[in-house]
Amino acid sequence: MNATKELTFNLLNKFQDKERFGSAQRHAGISLKGFISGILFSFLYFLFQLSLFIILRSRFKTIYQANVVLKIHPGSKVCFAKKKIKNYWSLFAFLKQLPGRMLDPMEKFERNERYGLDNYLFLRFLKLLIFFFAVLSIINIPILIPIHYFSRDILKENEGERYEQSFRTTSKLDKWTMSNLSPNSSNTLICHLFLSIFVVLWFHFILSSELRFVNRLGYSVLTKSKYQNILYLEGFSSKLVTQSISLETFFQPLHSDCFGVTHFIPKNLKKVHKLEIKLNKLQKSKEQIIFEIILEKYFRRVSIHRHLIANHKRFFFSKLKNHLLFQYKKLVFLTQFRISYYCTKIRLRWKKSSIFPLYYPKLYVNTETILERKYRILDKIIRKEKLIKFQVNSLKATSETKQALPDDLSSGTDIYMDKMFITFKSTLLSNVIGELLSYRLPTQNLKVIIGPNVNDIIWRNILDSSPLWKSAKYFSANILRIFVIIGWILPVAFLGLISQIPNISSLIPFTKIIHFQSPFIREVAKNLIPIVTLIIIIEIVPYFFRWLSYLRGLKTGAQIEADVQNWYFVFVFIHLFVVVTISSGFSIIIERLLNNPVSIPALLANDLPKCANFFCSFVLIRGMAYAGGNLLRIKELLFELFYYKWKRSTPHAQFKRLKTSLFFQLGSIYPIFSVLGCIGIIYSVVAPIILLLCCISFSMVFFSFSYLFKYQYNKENYSETFGKLYIQALMQLYAGIYFMEFCLLGLFTLFDQYTLSTIMLVVFALTVITHSKISKQIKSKPQRIPTLEYLSNLTEERKDQFCQESYTFHDIFSICRNSDEIWLPRDKLGISEEEQSFLEKSYHLKFDLNMYSMNLFGDCHLENSHLH
């Protein structure tokens, strides 16, 4: 007992002797060897990922070259299966084009781009950060690095202990930062002032030019985008429910002949959606059963016609290889589909006794064959599918019929909700009317969504009609967000515990296994483990914020992405930068600020230079880790090896996976690089070497995303915001500008350079005024209404692009739009044609045999180049 108390007392004393500073400050004084070793280890791991990716990209085309498989990339015209060397030349050609794309900061957006405007602007954001930091590195590094490095390290004793405590360096690495400045070199701070002003001016020049670019580009993209002539209205006057004539009269004064069709949301729509989900599952099951029947017949018939495999190759070893491969494929098929058959062949049934009023168990052996059982299941599925189709069509027909009923307010409010979709005959008029309705009076409870993509709508939140329940969810989500931001100090505090491993291992015997004896490994672990742990901790949070945005009742995925971006940026900036920099916990920050509210500049001036080594490592390691993960896609690779390789998926399922295996949720991607950009801005003067590291890091990430968009990404971005995420990301960089100005304000004060402090205070005030004006301009200016200058430059042909088609009830309200057409793979034995003929006569089903073909081993391959 006494030993336990003594151990606890020693441990607490050990930690109590340590200052309560941020975990990033423990990297102050790290040797140059330790810094380079951590970077080198991460770079070697990135090279390993890159090498593995180059080897695997030709073997797993569905993961790494989906666009080549889908025939939508120009390089797909080459037969990659016959000449695998072409894969490597294709990659080298892509690498050859990459520097030119990176050096062109004003690369234009092509309207036929598959990945949409938001994804294009994200690539532009990465390129913009590269260009922004490259210019700063060219100017700041040659000036500031010599000033920092050759400043005197030894301070005179009578010049004050506060400078010695705050700025004395312990390694060559710290000599590259402002930590190496002494009071005698305070005259050189004028260079830091001018360069910081240049950073602010350069940022505002980039910001203003990009805002103008996004506004011009957004208008041109809107003209050709689908669903942009639709308005969603909620809380409209109940007197207008079911009165299409009244609505048309309401909008007539705005513009003659602008009104299209009104679709009120019926209250039974939730029931329709449930039936559609069941119908979609039945359609997938039906296609899967038919596919299994074809495979069953194929493997039986090929076993009889073995010469098809034996004669496929001339040489003996080739014949043996084909035979073994066929037997392996057949074994996989049998283990996957016949186990369930034999499990249901013998059943236990309860039979009533003819003598006593009791039931007794009796074994029942199912005598039907595998094919008979599958045909019986298929017949049952088709009958159930027809019944659900009839129910869905009846409900839709009822809703569509009642849309055209005479005005009956009492019955209308019972049938419909106070929510509707209105289609207009022009995108421009729809956007203008939507913006006018958005500027409602405070007493009105009208909610407007302009141009919602019907595939992006979250119907559960739209169909939620209880005001009390919606308010409860909204306030609960906001409270939980605050708890997540504040309560995440526990995982971040764990990061501080990791950095205390040497202290723990010296006191607790069993923890010595994690205390490395090798000095080199210890330096690598000290530099690398906290960074990797911080990356993992930060990556978990977006899932919480996405769920909380859904809980708030947001009605489209685009709204959720914008909401997640704002909150996740706040979280990442606080925990990745503020908490890690200033202290090991959010509560300690509050405590220090409450005790001395005016100490913010001095606090930053003391702590920021000490954390320069940590963030220099973090920026580069984060970029390499993100780029390597983007290319290798380890999760998809593991699923391919251990799940899809053993699963016989239908052609429709394989095609859907090709199109949807890669998608980006930009709301949780933008904040990561916005915060890294803020860190680069903050340390652009304090530790200018970070500017070069930011360029390298963002270039690697840009390379990985460029490859994904060119060779892999082909999914339509339903959650398109038309540049809103990009504008928010640019405005979030102001956080880096403010913290840089605060830090320099504190540094100038600590060096008794009050003239420089006054100038920096004026710069800070001008930054706040400029930021306020730009924010007001963005909020007050309607983002979807073109300027008069843009409209005056439109030709008659381009004006016609504003005209949009009308949408039916099914187009808007259906959540499952799968075709009834069944895809079957065409085989050389003609089994698919036989099955098609039989099922068309028996059940009047529709088939397509031109999309996929089946090889000799039962594997399906895409044949057609059409995207569905």
Swiss-Prot record:
Q: Which parts of the chain does the record assign to the membrane side Cytoplasmic?
A: 56-127, 209-481, 549-569, 633-660, 714-730, 775-868
Q: Name one GO molecular function term.
A: calcium-activated cation channel activity
Membrane topology is: Multi-pass membrane protein
Instruction: Give a yes or no for keyword Glycoprotein in this entry.
Output: yes
The answer to whether keyword Glycoprotein applies is: yes
Query: What protein family is recorded?
Result: Belongs to the CSC1 (TC 1.A.17) family.
Q: This chain belongs to which protein, by name? A: Sporulation-specific protein 75
**Which species?**
Saccharomyces cerevisiae (strain ATCC 204508 / S288c) (Baker's yeast)
The upper taxonomy is: Eukaryota, Fungi, Dikarya, Ascomycota, Saccharomycotina
